[in-house]
Amino acid sequence: MKLDTITKIPKVLGAGIASTDGFVIESQFTVGYNAEKSAAMAAQVVNRIKQSLNIEKVSVIFYTQNSVFFIKETEAGIFFVTCHKDANIGLVKIKINKIT
């Protein structure tokens, strides 16, 4: 998957693909951000939502005080993106939908 398409967007901190059990398959993160923790969190969120809501595919956007997290379940695994809260969220969503 072309992660650099996402990570080239200003204020995107990183992107990656995780397995359903939270292991990193592929990632590109800036220095100081942990791909392993993000992958584990993404897998936990997807698994919890699937279990609670009994649905097939999951796509989630979390807004926090300083960051935005995108999580989308794909054929290749669980795709996740972390960015600053003032990143171009619309552009990030468009790029995610193009490559997943």
Task: Give names to the regions the model predicted.
Residues 1-100:
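Non-catalytic interaction/Regulatory regions outside core domains
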